[in-house]
Structure formats: C-alpha cells, structure tokens
From Swiss-Prot:
Assembly: Part of the 50S ribosomal subunit.
Family: Belongs to the universal ribosomal protein uL16 family.
GO terms of biological process kind: translation
Any one GO cellular component localisation term in the record: cytosolic large ribosomal subunit
Biological classification of the source: Bacteria, Bacillati, Actinomycetota, Actinomycetes, Mycobacteriales
Biased composition (Basic residues): 1-17
Natural source organism: Mycolicibacterium vanbaalenii (strain DSM 7251 / JCM 13017 / BCRC 16820 / KCTC 9966 / NRRL B-24157 / PYR-1) (Mycobacterium vanbaalenii)
Keyword presence, Membrane: no
Name recorded for this polypeptide: Large ribosomal subunit protein uL16
Keywords: Ribonucleoprotein, Ribosomal protein, RNA-binding, rRNA-binding, tRNA-binding
C-alpha cells in the first residue's frame, strides 16, 4: 500500500478539485499510459488494485510506472456520532487527480496486450480515463 512515511500534520484540509493538471500530462517513461479525463480522489487501495490488474495481465516482460502518490489524508467520523467534538480520524490516503494527468505508464512490446491491461486498470479507478501513447498529447 502506498502511504507517506512521515507527515508534518496528521489532518489536512480537503484539496480543491478544479482546474487541469499543469504537469505530468504526457507519457514520459513507458510507451502507453492512462490519462485522467476528470477530477477524482484516487485512494491508495484503488492505485494498488489497478497495479495488480496490470501486472496480472502482462505477466512478465513489461514494466509499470505509477505516476501518482496518495499524499493527502481524508478523515471520517465514526458512525452514529453526534456533531462537533473535533475533526474525525484519518481514514484514507488519496491522490488529488486533475484532468490530463497520466496516472500509470506501461512499457510492453505487444500493443494489444498492453491496451487490454490498461483497460482492466481503468475499470478499477473511480474516474473516466483514456489510454494514450507516447506520441499523443492532451
């Protein structure tokens, strides 16, 4: 699971979900990538699930890069708790994803298998996304 090793503050404000990604919008390491088409909070479990889906489909011979990191805590109060008495405890770690951001990159010799692996990963994510190649841009 991806979580920060150490954070300065345990609880943070929620990140804003507006605007488009300013960096990380092109495929720079692999040959194919998953590019976000909308805003979302992607949790560490969703990132791990998508990574496993890619690795199980390509088996061996390829390389996967994860370009996002869940560095923001989202808090939640327990069920049936009255209002007040402070902010809830951190429940999830999320990455704030903006449109245009490349989430995963994949290097694999066979294009058909690579596209199928990335499609399976997209189904694990809570966001609309598309598959891009190194030549395509947002």
């Amino acid at each position: 699971m991806l979580i920060p090793r150490k954070v300065k503050h345990r609880k943070q404000h929620h990140p804003k979900q507006r605007g488009i990604a300013s960096g990380g919008t092109s495929v720079s390491f692999g040959d194919y990538g998953i590019q976000a088409l909308g805003h979302a909070y992607v949790t560490n479990r969703q990132i791990e699930s998508a990574r496993i889906a890619i690795n199980r489909h390509i088996k061996r011979g390829g390389k996967v890069w994860i370009n996002i990191f869940p560095d923001r805590p989202l808090t939640k109060k327990p069920a049936e708790t009255r209002m007040g008495s402070g902010k809830g405890s951190p429940e999830w770690w999320v990455a704030n994803v903006k449109p245009g951001r490349v989430l995963f990159e994949l290097s694999y010799p066979d294009e058909k298998i690579a596209r199928e692996a990335l499609t399976r990963a997209i189904h694990k994510l809570p966001i609309k996304a598309r598959i891009v190649t190194r030549e395509e841009q947002f």
